[in-house]
Amino acid sequence: MIGKLTGTLLEKNPPEVLVDCHGVGYEVLVSMSTFYNLPAVGERVSLLTQFIVREDAQLLYGFGTAQERQAFRELIKISGVGPRTALSILSGMGVADLAQAVSLQEAGRLVKVPGIGKKTAERLLLELKGKLGADVGVRAHAANDNQADILQALLALGYNDKEAAAALKALPADVGVSEGIKLALKSLSK
Protein backbone atom coordinates (compact mmCIF):
# COMPACT_ATOMS: atom_id res chain seq x y z
CA MET A 1 0.00 0.00 0.00
CA ILE A 2 1.12 3.56 -0.68
CA GLY A 3 0.62 5.67 2.46
CA LYS A 4 2.31 8.94 1.55
CA LEU A 5 3.74 10.69 -1.50
CA THR A 6 6.32 13.44 -1.43
CA GLY A 7 7.56 14.95 -4.66
CA THR A 8 7.14 17.70 -7.20
CA LEU A 9 3.66 18.81 -8.20
CA LEU A 10 3.55 18.55 -12.01
CA GLU A 11 -0.12 19.17 -12.83
CA LYS A 12 -3.29 20.42 -11.12
CA ASN A 13 -6.58 19.53 -12.83
CA PRO A 14 -9.35 19.23 -10.23
CA PRO A 15 -9.91 16.77 -8.71
CA GLU A 16 -6.72 15.18 -10.02
CA VAL A 17 -3.09 16.12 -9.48
CA LEU A 18 0.11 14.61 -10.84
CA VAL A 19 3.01 14.19 -8.42
CA ASP A 20 6.52 13.29 -9.62
CA CYS A 21 8.33 11.11 -7.09
CA HIS A 22 11.88 10.42 -8.31
CA GLY A 23 10.88 10.08 -11.96
CA VAL A 24 7.57 8.27 -11.43
CA GLY A 25 4.40 10.32 -11.91
CA TYR A 26 1.48 9.42 -9.67
CA GLU A 27 -2.04 10.52 -10.58
CA VAL A 28 -3.80 11.33 -7.31
CA LEU A 29 -7.45 12.24 -6.76
CA VAL A 30 -7.87 14.88 -4.05
CA SER A 31 -10.75 16.67 -2.34
CA MET A 32 -11.28 20.31 -3.20
CA SER A 33 -10.17 21.40 0.28
CA THR A 34 -6.85 19.62 -0.26
CA PHE A 35 -6.65 20.93 -3.82
CA TYR A 36 -6.98 24.57 -2.73
CA ASN A 37 -4.22 24.11 -0.15
CA LEU A 38 -1.71 22.66 -2.63
CA PRO A 39 1.42 24.63 -3.55
CA ALA A 40 1.99 25.97 -7.07
CA VAL A 41 2.94 23.65 -9.92
CA GLY A 42 6.66 22.90 -9.79
CA GLU A 43 6.89 23.06 -5.99
CA ARG A 44 7.30 20.20 -3.52
CA VAL A 45 4.14 18.61 -2.18
CA SER A 46 3.44 15.94 0.40
CA LEU A 47 0.15 14.02 0.46
CA LEU A 48 -1.11 11.25 2.70
CA THR A 49 -2.74 8.63 0.48
CA GLN A 50 -5.25 5.82 0.33
CA PHE A 51 -4.74 3.21 -2.38
CA ILE A 52 -7.97 1.65 -3.66
CA VAL A 53 -7.90 -1.46 -5.85
CA ARG A 54 -11.04 -2.32 -7.76
CA GLU A 55 -11.78 -4.90 -10.40
CA ASP A 56 -11.34 -2.38 -13.20
CA ALA A 57 -9.01 0.25 -11.71
CA GLN A 58 -6.29 1.08 -9.20
CA LEU A 59 -6.83 4.56 -7.76
CA LEU A 60 -4.79 6.72 -5.44
CA TYR A 61 -6.58 9.27 -3.26
CA GLY A 62 -4.59 12.05 -1.59
CA PHE A 63 -5.22 14.11 1.53
CA GLY A 64 -3.61 17.16 3.10
CA THR A 65 -4.27 16.03 6.68
CA ALA A 66 -4.46 12.80 8.64
CA GLN A 67 -7.97 13.76 9.80
CA GLU A 68 -9.19 14.04 6.22
CA ARG A 69 -7.73 10.64 5.32
CA GLN A 70 -9.30 9.07 8.42
CA ALA A 71 -12.68 10.60 7.58
CA PHE A 72 -12.35 9.19 4.04
CA ARG A 73 -11.57 5.74 5.44
CA GLU A 74 -14.61 5.89 7.72
CA LEU A 75 -16.85 7.08 4.88
CA ILE A 76 -15.91 4.27 2.48
CA LYS A 77 -16.77 1.66 5.14
CA ILE A 78 -20.42 2.74 4.91
CA SER A 79 -22.66 0.74 2.60
CA GLY A 80 -23.51 2.74 -0.52
CA VAL A 81 -20.64 5.20 -0.10
CA GLY A 82 -17.75 4.55 -2.46
CA PRO A 83 -14.48 6.43 -2.81
CA ARG A 84 -15.89 8.98 -5.29
CA THR A 85 -18.86 9.77 -3.04
CA ALA A 86 -16.58 10.04 -0.01
CA LEU A 87 -14.34 12.45 -1.90
CA SER A 88 -17.41 14.44 -2.97
CA ILE A 89 -18.53 14.72 0.68
CA LEU A 90 -15.09 15.90 1.80
CA SER A 91 -14.99 18.36 -1.10
CA GLY A 92 -18.44 19.68 -0.30
CA MET A 93 -18.04 20.27 3.40
CA GLY A 94 -14.59 19.43 4.78
CA VAL A 95 -13.75 17.29 7.81
CA ALA A 96 -14.59 19.83 10.52
CA ASP A 97 -18.01 20.58 9.01
CA LEU A 98 -18.69 16.86 8.57
CA ALA A 99 -17.74 16.16 12.19
CA GLN A 100 -19.96 18.99 13.36
CA ALA A 101 -22.91 17.80 11.24
CA VAL A 102 -22.49 14.29 12.65
CA SER A 103 -22.16 15.41 16.27
CA LEU A 104 -25.23 17.66 15.97
CA GLN A 105 -27.11 15.08 13.81
CA GLU A 106 -27.80 17.62 11.04
CA ALA A 107 -28.85 15.60 7.98
CA GLY A 108 -29.80 18.81 6.16
CA ARG A 109 -26.15 19.83 5.87
CA LEU A 110 -25.21 16.50 4.28
CA VAL A 111 -28.09 16.62 1.79
CA LYS A 112 -26.57 19.81 0.33
CA VAL A 113 -23.62 17.75 -0.97
CA PRO A 114 -24.24 16.64 -4.60
CA GLY A 115 -25.13 12.94 -4.77
CA ILE A 116 -26.27 12.65 -1.13
CA GLY A 117 -29.97 12.07 -0.58
CA LYS A 118 -31.95 12.06 2.64
CA LYS A 119 -31.60 8.31 3.29
CA THR A 120 -27.86 8.33 2.63
CA ALA A 121 -27.44 11.38 4.88
CA GLU A 122 -29.30 9.64 7.71
CA ARG A 123 -27.18 6.49 7.26
CA LEU A 124 -24.02 8.62 7.35
CA LEU A 125 -25.10 10.29 10.60
CA LEU A 126 -25.91 6.96 12.19
CA GLU A 127 -22.75 5.14 11.14
CA LEU A 128 -20.27 8.00 11.64
CA LYS A 129 -21.39 8.91 15.16
CA GLY A 130 -18.33 8.79 17.41
CA LYS A 131 -15.96 7.75 14.62
CA LEU A 132 -14.50 11.04 13.38
CA GLY A 133 -12.40 11.70 16.46
CA ALA A 134 -13.32 13.80 19.45
CA ASP A 135 -10.72 16.46 18.68
CA VAL A 136 -12.09 17.05 15.17
CA GLY A 137 -15.62 17.46 16.56
CA VAL A 138 -14.45 19.78 19.32
CA ARG A 139 -12.42 21.95 16.96
CA ALA A 140 -15.40 22.12 14.58
CA HIS A 141 -17.47 23.95 17.21
CA ALA A 142 -14.67 26.17 18.49
CA ALA A 143 -13.56 29.45 16.94
CA ASN A 144 -10.22 29.44 18.81
CA ASP A 145 -8.11 27.36 21.21
CA ASN A 146 -9.74 28.84 24.32
CA GLN A 147 -13.17 27.87 23.06
CA ALA A 148 -11.89 24.39 22.18
CA ASP A 149 -10.58 23.99 25.75
CA ILE A 150 -13.89 25.19 27.19
CA LEU A 151 -15.83 22.80 24.98
CA GLN A 152 -13.53 19.90 25.89
CA ALA A 153 -14.07 20.66 29.60
CA LEU A 154 -17.85 20.69 29.17
CA LEU A 155 -17.76 17.37 27.34
CA ALA A 156 -15.54 15.90 30.08
CA LEU A 157 -18.11 17.03 32.65
CA GLY A 158 -20.74 14.91 30.91
CA TYR A 159 -22.60 17.42 28.76
CA ASN A 160 -23.48 16.21 25.26
CA ASP A 161 -22.27 17.87 22.04
CA LYS A 162 -25.46 19.89 21.50
CA GLU A 163 -25.54 21.28 25.04
CA ALA A 164 -21.85 22.14 25.04
CA ALA A 165 -22.00 23.75 21.58
CA ALA A 166 -25.05 25.82 22.56
CA ALA A 167 -23.31 27.05 25.73
CA LEU A 168 -20.20 27.88 23.70
CA LYS A 169 -22.19 29.98 21.20
CA ALA A 170 -23.50 32.14 24.05
CA LEU A 171 -19.96 33.06 25.18
CA PRO A 172 -17.99 36.10 23.99
CA ALA A 173 -15.34 35.06 21.43
CA ASP A 174 -12.45 36.49 23.46
CA VAL A 175 -13.34 34.92 26.83
CA GLY A 176 -10.59 33.16 28.83
CA VAL A 177 -10.79 29.44 29.57
CA SER A 178 -11.60 29.56 33.30
CA GLU A 179 -14.09 32.43 32.94
CA GLY A 180 -15.65 30.73 29.91
CA ILE A 181 -16.16 27.48 31.80
CA LYS A 182 -17.84 29.37 34.66
CA LEU A 183 -20.14 31.25 32.29
CA ALA A 184 -20.97 28.11 30.31
CA LEU A 185 -21.79 26.13 33.46
CA LYS A 186 -23.98 28.98 34.65
CA SER A 187 -25.92 29.02 31.36
CA LEU A 188 -26.25 25.21 31.35
CA SER A 189 -27.63 25.16 34.90
CA LYS A 190 -30.63 27.33 33.90
Curated annotation (Swiss-Prot):
GO MF: ATP binding; four-way junction DNA binding; four-way junction helicase activity
Annotated segments matching region Domain III: 142-190
Compartments, as annotated in UniProt: Cytoplasm
Region described as Domain I: 1-64
Major subcellular site: cytoplasm
Top-rank taxon: Bacteria
An annotated GO BP: DNA recombination
Pfam families: HHH_5, RuvA_C, RuvA_N
Gene3D superfamilies (alphabetical): 5' to 3' exonuclease, C-terminal subdomain (1.10.150.20), DNA helicase RuvA subunit, C-terminal domain (1.10.8.10), Nucleic acid-binding proteins (2.40.50.140)
Region (Domain II) location: 65-137
A cellular-component GO term for this protein: cytoplasm
Segments of this protein annotated with the region Flexible linker: 137-141
Keyword Coiled coil part of the UniProt annotation: no
Keyword field contains Repeat: no
Keywords: Cytoplasm, DNA damage, DNA recombination, DNA repair, DNA-binding
Subunit structure as annotated in this protein's UniProt entry: Homotetramer. Forms an RuvA(8)-RuvB(12)-Holliday junction (HJ) complex. HJ DNA is sandwiched between 2 RuvA tetramers; dsDNA enters through RuvA and exits via RuvB. An RuvB hexamer assembles on each DNA strand where it exits the tetramer. Each RuvB hexamer is contacted by two RuvA subunits (via domain III) on 2 adjacent RuvB subunits; this complex drives branch migration. In the full resolvosome a probable DNA-RuvA(4)-RuvB(12)-RuvC(2) complex forms which resolves the HJ.
Domain notes for this protein: Has three domains with a flexible linker between the domains II and III and assumes an 'L' shape. Domain III is highly mobile and contacts RuvB.
Role this protein plays: The RuvA-RuvB-RuvC complex processes Holliday junction (HJ) DNA during genetic recombination and DNA repair, while the RuvA-RuvB complex plays an important role in the rescue of blocked DNA replication forks via replication fork reversal (RFR). RuvA specifically binds to HJ cruciform DNA, conferring on it an open structure. The RuvB hexamer acts as an ATP-dependent pump, pulling dsDNA into and through the RuvAB complex. HJ branch migration allows RuvC to scan DNA until it finds its consensus sequence, where it cleaves and resolves the cruciform DNA.
Family, per entry: Belongs to the RuvA family.
Protein name as it appears in the record: Holliday junction branch migration complex subunit RuvA
Organism placement in taxonomy: Bacteria, Pseudomonadati, Pseudomonadota, Betaproteobacteria, Burkholderiales
